[in-house]
């Protein structure tokens, strides 16, 4: 029987958690939405729906712009898939990150118009802004789905982690985007409330263009 077990309303995020949700119900709810809000995560009967607010979205979008700027400057091919629903019925798991990218697998997946995660890999790099506690352990969820690298921001600082033998290990810089460090990203984000976004990205581009 499906039941609401938690509701969290906060400044950066609103979350609702349901338990006892069948896979087919989750898929139907996901397909009936307009757009990608609320963002959904599903893990063996537990469904979490999260609606981000301004600060959450601003952090996620800025990180995404830095990833795209860095890949352009360093000539690294990527495929952006934003908050695509990554779902595996065989695992009874699904997630929608703030930003998602193929890097290592970009060339392989370039010709594909649609993704089938029963045969296609999960995104190589996902960005997860989590300013309030999730009812689902996202790192375990990402690991089970085979995400190679996770950038996680808690509203204060960024942590980068790589998947090693099924467990995420912290690292100071990205493997998918070599040379880009968490400290560089945090430096830009620390100025987001005092400097306009265009200026931030222009300055970031100038610093990495050498």
Which residues are covered by each model-predicted region?
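Gly/Pro/Ser/Thr-rich low-complexity, intrinsically disordered segments predominantly at protein N-termini
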Residues: 1-210
């Amino acid at each position: 029987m499906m039941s609401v077990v938690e509701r969290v309303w906060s400044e950066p995020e609103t979350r609702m958690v349901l338990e006892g949700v069948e896979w087919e119900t989750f898929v139907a709810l996901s397909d009936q939405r307009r757009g990608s809000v609320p963002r959904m995560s599903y893990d063996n009967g537990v469904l979490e729906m999260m609606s981000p607010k301004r600060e959450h979205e601003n952090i996620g979008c800025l990180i995404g712009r830095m990833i795209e700027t860095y890949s352009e400057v360093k000539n690294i091919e990527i495929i952006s898939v934003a908050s695509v629903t990554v779902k595996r019925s065989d695992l009874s798991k699904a997630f929608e990150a703030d930003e998602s990218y193929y890097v290592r697998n970009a060339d392989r997946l370039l010709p594909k118009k649609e993704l089938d995660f029963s045969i296609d890999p999960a995104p190589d790099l996902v960005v997860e802004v989590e300013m309030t506690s999730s009812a689902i352990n996202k790192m375990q969820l990402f690991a089970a789905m085979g995400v190679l690298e996770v950038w996680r921001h808690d509203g204060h600082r960024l942590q980068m982690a790589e998947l090693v033998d099924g467990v995420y290990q912290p690292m100071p810089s990205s493997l998918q985007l070599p040379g880009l460090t968490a400290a560089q990203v945090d430096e830009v984000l620390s100025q987001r409330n005092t400097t306009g976004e265009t200026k931030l990205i222009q300055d970031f581009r100038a610093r990495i263009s050498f």
